[in-house]
From Swiss-Prot:
Optimum pH is 7.5-8.0. It is an enzyme of class 3 (hydrolase). SUPFAM superfamilies: DHH phosphoesterases. It comes from Bacillus subtilis (strain 168). This is Oligoribonuclease NrnB. One of its GO terms (cellular component) is cytoplasm.
Length: 399
């Protein structure tokens, strides 16, 4: 008998689907949260010891703690079979054990996923044969879990994850197993396509609303965008990161589950290291941790007093970013920032006072005022009134 304990996200459930296609009724699968795995593993090992059974155990997309690390060693030394397959770099130390198989990226530089690693492992060890449909499915899971879908605009990968969240785990699992075992190609049926189109519209409305709720602050040395959200963390983190490139990372708080999701679009930030400070982990661009007392104070209590950042005006005709006529910004404290080009450099005027520091590019000047003052591009009518007032003052000085 095989047992597979996996994460309860798309990549984790993808492992369960692959395992059921390989082992059929001979595998028992349980999906766990990050915090729930260790209790599950401990219970399995205790029951195995009591019954003197040595079933094979797969652990995928999750890592065990030190106590279970030792217990798994004892189980293997007693004749039990264990294989832990993961792709998070925070689990690389488990490769010290013969039962550990942790690989962050392939030889060609592509990032791995637990589903793609398990699929490759089962094929290599003769447990299953590859198919076109499974190749396509596991690749979509990998692309979504590693954010590669966003880089190459692979919307099918995102839609697969959307479908995963629209269905129960049991229903999603059953649909995928039936489809992958009876078709040569992976596809969404007509009903799913319509359902996913409606979901796209719903997500877009949700992202627009949450964009207006984000606050900005410094947490230690990093400039962070903080927002409370229960859904669509990947899409939200990606959108907020792209719209606010001056932010080092986005922290998405889910108070119901007492979890924080950390997302970044930058290569110079590794949010798995940040999550590691608070007992969490994950990938360089997507990680998470529990809301401990320390995390609550930093990301909830202190941020609660801060007003949300106003989004940049997006329907302007005149007040445009990088315009030769200048660009006008304002923050919640009613401070005004006028960015204008002069002698091949960009200058900043704060409340009418031109600053000594200049910038080689508009993006650098905007990054400075957004990061340090949480400024936002104002609407055209405010910009036109500002120009009219400055023109009036200039004419008065000439007189």
């Amino acid at each position: 008998m095989y047992h597979l304990y996996s994460h309860n996200d798309l990549d984790g459930v993808g492992c369960g689907i692959v395992a059921k296609l390989a082992f059929g009724k001979d595998v028992e699968i349980r999906y766990n949260s990050v915090n729930g795995l260790n209790a599950q593993v401990q219970y399995f090992l205790e029951k195995a010891k009591e019954s003197n059974r040595q079933d094979a155990l797969f652990i995928t997309d999750l890592a065990v703690n030190e106590e279970n690390e030792e217990r798994l060693n004892e189980y293997v030394h007693a004749g039990g079979k264990v294989k832990l397959i993961d792709h998070h770099k925070t689990a690389l130390h488990l490769n010290e054990h013969e039962w550990g198989f942790v690989q962050v990226e392939y030889d060609d530089g592509r990032l791995t996923s637990a589903t793609s690693l398990l699929y490759g492992y089962l094929i290599e060890n003769g447990f299953m044969k590859p198919t076109n449909a499974l190749d396509q499915f596991t690749e979509l899971v990998r692309q979504y879990d590693t954010w590669e879908w966003e880089r190459y605009d692979q919307k099918q990968a995102k839609r697969l994850n959307d479908l995963f969240f629209l269905l129960s785990i049991d229903e999603f699992e059953a649909k995928m197993i039936q489809r992958l075992s009876t078709h040569d190609e992976f596809f969404f049926d007509d009903f799913e396509e319509k359902l996913l189109d409606l979901e796209d519209e719903k997500i877009e409305r949700y992202l627009r609303r949450k964009k207006r709720e984000m606050v900005q602050t410094f947490v230690h040395e990093h400039c962070v965008g903080i927002v409370h959200a229960e859904s669509y963390h990947s899409e939200l983190g990606n959108r907020l990161g792209k719209d606010n490139p001056h932010l080092d990372y986005i922290a998405i708080l889910s108070m119901g589950s007492k979890r924080v999701s950390l997302r970044t679009i930058h290569d110079y930030i590794d949010v798995s290291e940040i999550a590691g400070r608070y007992g969490g982990g994950g990938h360089a661009k997507a990680s998470g941790c529990s809301i401990t007392d320390e995390v609550y104070e930093l990301f909830v209590a202190e941020a609660f007093r801060i007003d949300p950042v106003r989004p940049d005006a997006f329907r302007n005709i005149y007040n445009l970013k990088g315009s030769a006529n200048g660009s006008l910004y304002e923050n919640r404290a009613q401070m005004r920032f006028f960015l204008f080009p002069l002698d091949n450099e960009w200058n900043i005027q704060i409340n009418g006072e031109t600053q000594d520091e200049t910038f080689a590019a508009f993006e650098e000047a905007e990054w400075f005022i957004k990061r340090n003052y949480a400024a936002s591009l104002v609407r055209d009518e405010v910009f036109v009134a500002f120009l009219a007032e400055n023109l009036k003052l200039a004419n008065q000085h000439r007189k």
